[in-house]
């Protein structure tokens, strides 16, 4: 359902964004299935990547496999600041707010993207902190039922759609302002991140993304729950009006 927005409705400021770009060092916060798989892809491509994992055991396991991982968030973000790294937030939605506050404290100069499956709540947290200029939302449309570093694998995103939001550009253009070059560069970096991971970048607005994901991803779960309720009550004829 996301595919319908590939070539329509994109702001003029990003129409020329294309071709390969050089990724800066990439700092991944949260190394579960998605974050860990991104780390594996970037490492396999020979790019500079390091990260933080809340789970000490997960961080140790990743380190034993040869990846540059720490369980010290402030130290990792301070390093990202020194490197002017691209920060990828790959934690559950309930942890995003604390991560953003830590980024504001330790890496206020870094560009930020995320991989959270719903974009509006993240966008609201970004706006509340005045971070729109250095944020481009993302959502790789791939995954498995497993979680944690042990579930991550190289190639998880091959041929997957990777939604990339452009709402800040829309807001600038509606206000008659030029979209800052720094933001356009960041948008290009996130597109390149998707490409390196084998995915296809799909520009989309926050609202259109969430509408599409609700139809494609969440509706089956709602239907499954409804069917379970029907089954518990003995079939369709027994469901209360």
Describe the residue ranges of each PLM region.
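NAD(P)+-binding Rossmann beta1-loop-alpha1 motif at the extreme N-terminus of oxidoreductases
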Residues: 2-82
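Residues at the starts of beta-strands that form the adenosine-phosphate
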Residues: 25, 48-50, 134, 161, ...
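Rossmann-like NAD(P)-binding element
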Residues: 73-113
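Internal alpha-helical scaffold of NAD(P)-dependent oxidoreductase catalytic cores
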Residues: 156-241
């Amino acid at each position: 359902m996301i595919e319908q927005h590939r070539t329509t409705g994109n702001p003029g400021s990003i129409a020329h964004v294309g071709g390969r770009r050089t990724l800066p060092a990439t700092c991944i916060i949260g190394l579960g299935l998605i974050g860990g798989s991104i780390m594996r892809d970037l490492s396999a491509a020979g790019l500079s990547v390091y990260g933080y994992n809340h789970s000490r055991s997960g961080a140790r396991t990743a380190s034993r496999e040869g990846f540059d991982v720490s369980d010290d968030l402030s130290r990792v973000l301070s390093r990202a600041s020194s490197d002017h790294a691209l920060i990828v937030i790959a934690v559950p939605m309930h942890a995003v707010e604390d991560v953003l506050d830590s980024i504001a404290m330790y890496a206020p100069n870094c560009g930020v993207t995320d991989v959270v499956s719903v974009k509006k709540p993240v966008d609201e947290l970004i706006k509340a902190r005045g971070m729109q200029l250095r944020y481009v939302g993302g959502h790789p449309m791939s995954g498995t039922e497993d979680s944690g570093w042990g579930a991550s694998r190289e190639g998880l995103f091959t041929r997957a759609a990777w939604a990339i939001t452009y709402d800040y550009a829309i807001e600038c253009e509606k206000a008659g302002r030029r979209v800052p070059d720094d933001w356009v560069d960041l948008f290009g970096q996130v597109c390149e991140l998707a490409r390196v991971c084998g995915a296809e970048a799909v520009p989309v607005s926050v609202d259109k993304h969430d509408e599409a994901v609700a139809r494609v991803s969440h509706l089956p779960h709602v239907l499954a729950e409804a069917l379970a309720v029907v089954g518990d009550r003995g079939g369709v004829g027994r469901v209360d009006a």
